[in-house]
Structures are given as structure tokens and as C-alpha cells.
């Protein structure tokens, strides 16, 4: 599995190059949204291959999820769960290349143990490369639409007017914010907590400038490759992408939602770390 993991990381890094500037241009047209690609073992996003153990490191959880595609964390996705007065359902959103178990095998059970109704999902996986354990690699806008459908399902099951989000990387940044700002989510979310969330786009340690310098013919080829393999999310998260500008052009936040962002100077993927921070232009917190 070490070889597979290294290959996966390498492929994901290459995808950053292959998905960048051309996809950012395509993002200006809603008609160009790549259709959502479902994970075979997670119909409608719901992991359907049993429940796995709790892991304390992401690498261990990732390894287990690769051997058990579609596995879920303990305690999540109980659609008969009764939300306690004053609480809201908590939706855990993985990041790019993540999945429900690899990202949330530790947090999911602990939140459920504290009495929260907890939900998570995996969707928008690659085509013809990697496997379905690498979720949310496709067009962020398609993932945002899928998030909206998941939110509505949770709200209907629990009778709750609003939900709380806890998201990692893409799942705490551009994905929930695209849903909130572009797909009617503003009235359905009470809190958004982002863990190392690239709200203003990442420089990917200089890859953004490298991509900008590629010849147009190379960009066109790589754009087609990333579309064919459903890997657009990497480029859409680079600093300056058209989708970043579209999502954040009217400010970072919207009224009525409480925002929390937790960042670290030690992150080597979402760089610089200051791109993680919200301004206080419209936030409740």
C-alpha cells in the first residue's frame, strides 16, 4: 500500500498542473460544469460498505479506506437521529482527494459520542485514474450541488432548519462557500468551521506561477486531460482561478453564518497559510 499511496500523491500533484488555468477559464460558464461522478460504493454519497474502526492518524485511516472502499466512520449517517434542542445536525465535509472515512474516522465517532447527529459523504471521484477513495477531485461546482442535495436530505430527516458544517481543506473552504453563495445554501447553514481551508486559493508552493508560464497549447491539452479524468478541483483551488474570484468576489462571508477557520503555518499544500483566513466583512463571528 505504500507504493499505491506514493503513486496517488504523485498523481494528485500532477493533477494540480493539469487542471489549473484552463479550467479556471471554463469556470466562468455554468454550462461547462462537469457532471458529478458518483462513488460506486457510496450511492448518493452515502458510504455503503459497513463501518470501520477509529484511527488517530489520517495515514492509517487512508490506508484502511483504500482496502475497504465505501467504509463509513462509526456513529455517522443515522437518519433517525434526534437533534437535541439548541443543536443542529453536523455535516463533515472531506477535502480534495479525501473521503468520509479517511478524513473523519476519528472526529465522526467523537462528535456522535457527544450527542450530535453527524453526517458525512463521499462523491465526485476521478475517472480512469486513482480510485473512488479519492473523492471531491471533480468540478467544485458539481460537488457544491451534491452538498446541497445532501444538506436537504439531512434537514428533511432531522426536521432541522439549518445545519453546521465542519470541513477540511476544500471541504472547509471553496466547496461549502460555493454552495452557500451560488446554490442557495445561505439560509440553510448556521456555522461553518474550516480546518486548513484554502478560502483565497493556494499557491501550491509556487505551482500557480509555473502553470501560468505554460504554453497555451500545453494548457489546452492538460485542460482536456483534467476534464476527462474528473480532476478539475485541483486547478480551481489555485490562487487567482476564475472560480475563486467568482465565489469570493463579494467578500468572504455572508450575514447570518458564524465562521471559524483553523490554520497552521506548517501546511505545505495550502500556501501561504494566510490564504486560510476570512475577513470580517459580513460574518457573525
Annotate each PLM feature.
Residues 130-146:
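Catalytic nucleophile-loop/oxyanion-hole region of alpha/beta-hydrolase
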Residues 271-277:
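Short alpha-helix in the alpha/beta-hydrolase fold that links the catalytic acid
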Residues 112-129:
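Conserved alpha/beta-hydrolase
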Residues 261-263:
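Short beta-strand/loop motif that positions the catalytic acidic residue
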Residues 278-285:
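Conserved small/polar residues in nucleotide/adenosyl-binding loops
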Residues 2-110:
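Flexible, membrane-associating and regulatory peripheral segments of lipid-active enzymes
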Residues 266-270:
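Acidic catalytic loop of the alpha/beta-hydrolase fold
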Residues 94, 143-247:
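Serine-dependent carboxylesterase/thioesterase catalytic core
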Amino acid at each position: 500500500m505504500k507504493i499505491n499511496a506514493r503513486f496517488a500523491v504523485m498523481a494528485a500533484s500532477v493533477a494540480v498542473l493539469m487542471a489549473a488555468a484552463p479550467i479556471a477559464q471554463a469556470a466562468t460558464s455554468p454550462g461547462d460544469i462537469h457532471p458529478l461522478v458518483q462513488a460506486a460504493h457510496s450511492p448518493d454519497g452515502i458510504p455503503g460498505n459497513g463501518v470501520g474502526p477509529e484511527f488517530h492518524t489520517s495515514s492509517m485511516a487512508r490506508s484502511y479506506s483504500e482496502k475497504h472502499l465505501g467504509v463509513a466512520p462509526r456513529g455517522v449517517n443515522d437518519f433517525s437521529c434526534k437533534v437535541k434542542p439548541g443543536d443542529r445536525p453536523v455535516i463533515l465535509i472531506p477535502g480534495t482527494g479525501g473521503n468520509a472515512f479517511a478524513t473523519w474516522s476519528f472526529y465522526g465517532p467523537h462528535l456522535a459520542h457527544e450527542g450530535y447527529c453527524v453526517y458525512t459523504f463521499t462523491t465526485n471521484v476521478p475517472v480512469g485514474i486513482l480510485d473512488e477513495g479519492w473523492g471531491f477531485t471533480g468540478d467544485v461546482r458539481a460537488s457544491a450541488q451534491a452538498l446541497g442535495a445532501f444538506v436537504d436530505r439531512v434537514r428533511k430527516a432531522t426536521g432541522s432548519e439549518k445545519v453546521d458544517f465542519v470541513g477540511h481543506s476544500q471541504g472547509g473552504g471553496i466547496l461549502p462557500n460555493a454552495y452557500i453563495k451560488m446554490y442557495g445554501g445561505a439560509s440553510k447553514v448556521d456555522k461553518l468551521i474550516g480546518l486548513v481551508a484554502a478560502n483565497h486559493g493556494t499557491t501550491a508552493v509556487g505551482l500557480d506561477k509555473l502553470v501560468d508560464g505554460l504554453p497555451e497549447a500545453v494548457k489546452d491539452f492538460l485542460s482536456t486531460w483534467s476534464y476527462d479524468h474528473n480532476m478539475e478541483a485541483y486547478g480551481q483551488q489555485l490562487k487567482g482561478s476564475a472560480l475563486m474570484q467568482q465565489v469570493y468576489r463579494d467578500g468572504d462571508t455572508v450575514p447570518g453564518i458564524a465562521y471559524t477557520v483553523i490554520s497552521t503555518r506548517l501546511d505545505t499544500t495550502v500556501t501561504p497559510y494566510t490564504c486560510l483566513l476570512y475577513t470580517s466583512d459580513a460574518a457573525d463571528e
